[in-house]
Amino acid sequence: MRLIIVSGRSGSGKSTALNVLEDNGFYCIDNLPAGLLPELAERALLHTELLHPQVAVSIDARNLPSQLKRFPELLEEVRARHIQCDVLYLDADDETLLKRFSETRRRHPLTNESRSLAEAIRDEELLLAAIIDHADLKIDTTHLNLYQLRDMLKLRLLNKPEPGTAFLIESFGFKRGMPVDADLVFDVRCLPNPYWKAELRDFSGLDQPVIDYLAAQPDVEEMFQDIHAYLNKWLPRFAASNRAYVTIAIGCTGGHHRSVYLAERLGLALKEPLKNLQVRHRDLA
């Protein structure tokens, strides 16, 4: 049995995550009381013919605070039964969550006469602290639309070709914010920028003219060799520590040229030693 626990602040995309998982064969349960997690695991062991082999449940701030505080011990009970269990935590910045609630006009579950929407959003993070601390995969949905979030969920949760740590190399542009869910961040803004070459500006790091330009720059090659040497040495150590997911972010100014080029090269260079490796370009249209 595979169990995915989906959590996150309201408006971060939990419903979308459950829909994606359901569309891909998971039996989904929304707003499961956290205290029922061990019972769900026990039933899975005793009645394997009755329960679906892939189950996803959402646990969020609608739970009793006392149950949320017990999440670490409840999770340990589940994993002690040797069930493959991943904890997914979705989030977005406060401003984005406020905007989403304003646009949909939905009521936040924690708002009341004495608590404003902004206060509810802040308080929700405190309530979910125990889940945040034990999340295997965190996804920041601030800059993701509905379709991008669906693609990201499929990429990270459903496309693991074999057991072990799932690695993601992600290019991004600092002008749209640094990905808060990254485990390692490399800033490559010091490298020559193709954007300032008029004939290269409209291309990306996936296009041959930009590839040829950057491949000819000594500083770019040196940066690639240094990052590759670091990742080649240390990523296997992450895998050996039983990490389920590791995200490596490569950032330039706009996320179109230098970071894309280096992410692609690193993906190719590390594909053989790291079987579960994927490359994504956050800011390419």
Swiss-Prot record:
This protein's record includes keyword Metal-binding: no
Q: Which residues bind GTP?
A: D60, A61, R62, N63
Q: Name one Pfam family in it.
A: RapZ-like_N
Q: Which residues form a coiled coil?
A: none
Residues reported to bind ATP: G8, R9, S10, G11, S12, G13, K14, S15
Which GO terms fall under molecular function for this chain's record? ATP binding; GTP binding
The record, for InterPro entries, names:
P-loop_NTPase, RapZ-like, RapZ-like_N, RapZ_C
Q: List the disulfide bonds.
A: none
Q: Does the keyword Hydrolase apply?
A: no
Keyword annotations for this protein, in alphabetical order, are:
ATP-binding, GTP-binding, Nucleotide-binding
- Gene3D superfamilies, A to Z: P-loop containing nucleotide triphosphate hydrolases
Domain of life from the UniProt record: Bacteria
Q: What does this protein do?
A: Displays ATPase and GTPase activities.
Mind telling me which PANTHER family this protein's record contains?
A: RNASE ADAPTER PROTEIN RAPZ (PTHR30448:SF0)
The record's comment on protein family reads: Belongs to the RapZ-like family.
The protein, known as: Nucleotide-binding protein PST_1028
- Give the species this sequence originates from: Stutzerimonas stutzeri (strain A1501)
